[in-house]
UniProtKB/Swiss-Prot annotation:
<dbReference type="InterPro" id="IPR024280">
    <property type="entry name" value="FAM167"/>
</dbReference>
<protein>
    <recommendedName>
        <fullName>Protein FAM167B</fullName>
    </recommendedName>
</protein>
<dbReference type="Pfam" id="PF11652">
    <property type="entry name" value="FAM167"/>
</dbReference>
<keyword id="KW-0175">Coiled coil</keyword>
<comment type="similarity">
    <text>Belongs to the FAM167 (SEC) family.</text>
</comment>
<feature type="coiled-coil region">
    <location>
        <begin position="73"/>
        <end position="132"/>
    </location>
</feature>
<dbReference type="InterPro" id="IPR051771">
    <property type="entry name" value="FAM167_domain"/>
</dbReference>
C-alpha cells in the first residue's frame, strides 16, 4: 500500500469500512478473474466440513453449546488444535521452501560464476589470438628477443625454445 492511498480520518468514521469492503471485493474479483483457488487439503477439508449437513443442522437449531457450534468444530479446543496443526504444517512448508530457495540461489550464483569465468577465458583467448595474428606485434618483439632464441609463437604459448 503506497502512502498516497492512505487517508487519515477521525475515529468512528465508516469510510474505512467501505474501503476495506471495496478492496476485499476487488481482491475477490481478481481471484475469480484469474481463477485462483486454494489447493491446501486442510482448507478444502475445512470448507467441506463447514458446508456439510452437520453445519447446516447446527445453523437451523440455534442452541448454544451444541455440536458443530463453532465454525463446524465441536468445541473451541478442537478448533484451536486444528489451527495449531495447520500453523505447524505451514511452518514446515515455509522451512522447506526457504531451503529450496537457498539451494536455487546457490545454484544461480554458481552458474553466474561459471559464465563469468567462461567469458573471461574467451576474452583472454581472443586477445591471445589477436596478438598471434597481428603482424606488427611480432616484429616489435623480434629484435629484442631474437638474440635469446625466442620466437613469437613460443611467447604466446609460454614455452621458450632455442633457435
Amino acid at each position: 500500500m503506497s502512502l498516497g492511498l492512505l487517508k487519515f480520518q477521525a475515529v468512528g468514521e465508516e469510510d474505512e469500512e467501505d474501503e476495506e469492503g471495496e478492496s476485499l471485493d476487488s481482491v475477490k474479483a481478481l481471484t475469480a478473474k484469474l481463477q485462483l483457488q486454494t489447493r491446501r487439503p486442510s482448507y478444502l477439508e475445512w470448507t467441506a466440513q463447514v458446508q456439510s449437513q452437520a453445519w447446516r443442522r447446527a445453523q437451523a437449531k440455534p442452541g448454544p453449546g451444541g455440536p458443530g457450534d463453532i465454525c463446524g468444530f465441536d468445541s473451541m479446543d478442537s478448533a484451536l488444535e486444528w489451527l495449531r496443526r495447520e500453523l505447524r504444517e505451514m511452518q514446515a512448508q515455509d522451512r522447506q521452501l526457504a531451503g529450496q530457495l537457498l539451494r536455487l540461489r546457490a545454484q544461480l550464483h554458481r552458474l553466474k560464476m561459471d559464465q563469468a569465468c567462461h567469458l573471461h577465458q574467451e576474452l583472454l583467448d581472443e586477445a591471445e589470438l589477436e596478438l598471434e595474428l597481428e603482424p606488427g606485434a611480432g616484429l616489435a618483439l623480434a629484435p629484442l628477443l631474437r638474440h635469446l632464441g625466442l620466437t613469437r609463437m613460443n611467447i604466446s604459448a609460454r614455452r621458450f625454445t632455442l633457435c
